[in-house]
Structure formats: C-alpha cells, structure tokens
Amino acid sequence: LTGQLYDPSDPELDQLRLKARKLARRYNMTDEDEREKRYKILKELLPNTLEMPDLQAPVYFDYGCNTYFGKYSGANFHFTCLDVCPVHIGDNVMIGPNVTIATPMHPMLPEERNCRLREDGSIYNLEYAKPVTIENDCWLAANIVVCGGVTIGEGSVIGAGSVVTKSIPPHSLAVGNPCRVVREITEEDRMEQR
C-alpha cells in the first residue's frame, strides 16, 4: 500500500484491522506479571518481530503485521501505531508515553479526499501511506507524533511534545512542532560530563 491510493474499508483490510485490534485489546487486559500470556499475544499481534518488545499497556495497532521491532526496544503507556505500511523500529529504541506513529496519509485536495458513495449506498474514502523508520538507539520522549515518510536517524533524541513531519539525521536532538534539529548529540552529553 506504500504510496498508492487505497480504500481502507476493503473487506480484507477490515479483517486484518479487526484481528489486530482484538489482539491489542486482549493484551491491554493483561497484567504486567502475566509475562507468558503477554508474550503469546504479542507473537500473534506482531508476527514479523523476532524479539518481542517491552510494551506497557494500553497499546493500539492498525495491523501489527506491518510493525517490526528490533532487540531491546519498547514503548511506554498509550503507544499507537497506525501501521498501514511498514514501521521499522530498531534495536535499543525507547518510546515514551502517548507516542503515535501514523503512516496513513490523506490527499490534500478535497475532491480526492472527500467521502464517496458506493452503488450499495455505503460510504468510503481513499488514503495512502508512507513508511516510518526509527533507527537503532533512539529515544522518543512523551507525547510525540511521527508522521508517515519519516526516518529518525540512529542515536537521535526527539523531545517531548514534538510532531515529526520530516526526517531527522543521526545523532540529533530534535524538538518542536514541527520538529527541528536543535543540535548534534556529542560526547559532551555523557552523564559524567554534567
């Protein structure tokens, strides 16, 4: 679906979303000490992830099967991943609370974006999607939105409340709405230097 207009109400897509939402709901109903149960649910929800991430419930996924987590990565409460197309999250990625990754996009022109009426009387619209990549060793603080088409470079930190609409180069501290690079992360940022 990357970059192509599609109907999100397609019956096959509806079934995939329903499955992911049911699995996420089951996961969200578990307690933190039910590790084995959580692991089994995540294996089904995220079938393309080899090592299951540490996810604090609640979590929400559009499909799950389009999200790939690397080793030792995780997300705090209220992680939302609208994974219409691939979302790659690298190794050692920390995701703070209330972070949304949104790959779906809608056309800018109203005549392309507006709802349409099918012959059977049902309504639909069209959308497209762009992938998201978060490279290894990144930290996304709280209340961040990452939009489709973005790559966050290795070792970068995204400040709380940011809306990331453009790619961020490696080893950058970036903040704001829209998110902008403030400076490069260097050896001077080591805790022992503070």
Stretch-by-stretch model annotation:
Residues 44-45, 67-69, 168:
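Short, T/G/N/S-enriched strand-turn elements that build extracellular solenoid repeat scaffolds
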Residues 1-51, 108-111, 178-194:
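Terminal amphipathic alpha-helical/low-complexity segments used for targeting or macromolecular assembly
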Residues 145-175, 179:
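C-terminal/domain-terminus segments
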Residues 1, 133-135, 153, 169:
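Residue-level recognition of short, solvent-exposed, well-ordered loop/turn junctions
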Residues 53-55:
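Extracellular beta-strand-rich, repetitive "passenger/adhesive" scaffolds
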